[in-house]
Amino acid sequence: MLFSRSGRSIFPLLPPYAAHAPNPNQGHIIALPPDGLTPYLGLRARLSQVWINRWTILLLLVLVRVLLAASGLQADMSTAKREALSACTSVESMGSSMASMPHYLSQGVNELTATGVEKAVSGLKSMLMLTITGVEELVLFIIKVLYQTYLCLFTLAVRGSVHVAVGVIKEAADFLNSTVKEVGDDIGKAVSTFESAFNKFLDGVNTVASAFGASVPTLDLNSSISTLENLQLPSSIDQGLDKLNSSLPTFDEVNNFTQTVLRTPFEEVKKLVNESLGTYTFDRSLLPVPAKEQLTFCEGSNGIDSFFDSVTDLVMKARKIFIAILIVAATLACVPMAWQEIRRWRSMKERSQLVRKEAHDPMDVVYIVSRPYTAAAGIKAASRFSNSRRQILVRWAIAYATTPAALFVLCLGVAGLLSCLCQYLLLQAVEKTVPELSTQVGAFADKVVDSLQNASAEWANDANGVIGHMSQDLNENVFGWVNTSTTALNDTLNTFVDKTTGVLNDTFGGTLLYEPLMDVFGCLIGLKVQGIQKGLTWVHDHAHIDFPLLPNDTFSRGAAASISSNSSNPSDSFLADAGDQTSNKITEVVIRVVNKVEDGIRTETIISGVIILIWVFIALIGIVRALTLFWVRDRNRGEGGGARVNHHLSDAGGFIDVPLMAVSNTNTDARSMPPPAPAPRYEASTSTVVASRAVPVSSTHHEDEKLGFAGERQYGSALKVDGAADLRGSSYVEYDMEKR
């Protein structure tokens, strides 16, 4: 194709299309033959570049970023593996130290246990001595109170009765003795008088009788009277009562006997307690000392290696999946893009006819042809409005937000978010494997705790055996005598009751006082003695000692509690350092890598979001600009508005020819091609269809039309269809779009 110098000098951006016209003066564009050369790309040429469409390139960039992230994650995991193995070695050393801790702690615990036992035995000795002494004096006091009370009552009853009886007998005897003597004296006097008179009478009788040779005896009653005068009660009448009064028991013998009998077992028990617990020393050599432990769970353990190998396999698998998916997606993106190019090519060919038709706004035509999809989107959105001004503003806002630069920013942000999504999916897959490592580390901790529990249980069993043997020895050697003493005390009380009963039986047996005295004895003493015997029986049944035994988890309870699920603070684990957020140093390494990758993804997401916000800001600029002019009414010519361009009649095809004025071309080729027409220039068509002549266009009007800013061009100069009247007051062309 030949380009004239004059054509380029007059309108250098357009080639001399009229050079191919059979009649250069006609001014119509003649299509080139299908197999001819064209300065623009044809369909095949366009399809040859489908593989470098923006979506394929963006997907490939996403793939590259994901591959870089996977490589970085793999490198970080390699570093984490080394750190984890190092941490495992540290944990192994710490676990060995903890497992050996019973060896070191047992010595102090054994000393503490032995000292506690010695202090307990010393306190037991003091308590026993005080208790035995207190019980001894208490028993003696109670018995003394009992028999002295009984003695007082007995003395009051018996001695009082005897004293009364003896007094009565003495007074009766004295009264009888004095009365009998007086009666004898009186009788003696009377008898003496009678005897004197009678003897005188007998003397007379004897005088008479002597005459007859006989005599009468005299009366002599003096001896009988003397006997009556000397009559008195025998002194032995109250000797029995005096003997009974003097023979009342004072229970001194019972008191001495009882105290001797009661104190004997108590003193024996005190002696035995002093001999058994005089200076008690616990044999510390009997308590065991566990041996040291050496734990090995890093060497020959596939826990950490298998975890990181699985993570590496996961990353490699994810890399392959992303490569396959993104490459397939990038390849498949070529199919719709090829179809889009075909449709774009067809649309360009169809819309290129607008150049030959009545085109009042050539820049709009060029925009529609060059940006078919964004222009179609704008036309679709504008079809919702009936006002041509608002239609243009809507199209302008969409065109402003869909410029190549704006779409590049949007695609870049979307690609960044897609890359972050792929990295996030990869990170989530890695995070799901962290519990597996925690399980492996938990197995390490369980090994340490199991070793501690075994050592603690073995030590506790041996120590408890020693403590149990000591408790048995104390029960036999100390509390055995307590049992013996309670039995002896019960026997002593029985002896006391029997002895007292024997004394009462010997004293009052067969008398009227025996039964009442025995009832009083049973009420005052017998019931109390029975209560004491019950208490002694209870002491006999419960007199034993049981020292508390050591629990089996003495050395392992704290370690087991630190790794249990009930622990609220993960840093309490013995595998973690102070301030660690995870339960152990091994998983801390992996968590640190995951947090690092997560921070990187978060940063990239923020950057991608900011890029998308930049596009949103650009779109908002266009929307705000359109809204600013949306409600502004059209300016009339008198208010500074432009003049209305007259519309001309169309031809039978419905379009007005736009003549392309050509300039002469001095260059000819070997085929003697006709001189090309000058560069095309848009002109307003006349009312006739055939004639086409050049109509000068104002430079100011040309500049207004070329700017393309909303509100800066003549809205009435838009494309018009069929030359019909604008029923809606708009000269905006309808591109086969139904307005609603």
UniProtKB/Swiss-Prot annotation:
Membrane topology summary: Multi-pass membrane protein
KW Transmembrane (keyword) present: yes
UniProt record, GO biological process: plasma membrane fusion involved in cytogamy
Alphabetical UniProt keywords: Cell membrane, Conjugation, Glycoprotein, Membrane, Transmembrane, Transmembrane helix
Record field: transmembrane: 55-75, 138-158, 321-341, 398-418, 604-624
Extracellular domain ranges by topology: 1-54, 159-320, 419-603
Residue intervals annotated with topology Cytoplasmic: 76-137, 342-397, 625-740
Annotated Gene Ontology cellular component terms: mating projection tip; plasma membrane
Glycosylation sites per record: 177, 222, 245, 256, 274, 454, 483, 490, 505, 552, 566
Location within or outside the cell: Cell membrane
PANTHER family: PLASMA MEMBRANE FUSION PROTEIN PRM1
Functional description taken from the UniProt entry: Involved in cell fusion during mating by stabilizing the plasma membrane fusion event.
Family as reported in the entry's similarity comment: Belongs to the PRM1 family.
Name used for this protein in its record: Plasma membrane fusion protein prm1
Native species: Aspergillus fumigatus (strain CBS 144.89 / FGSC A1163 / CEA10)
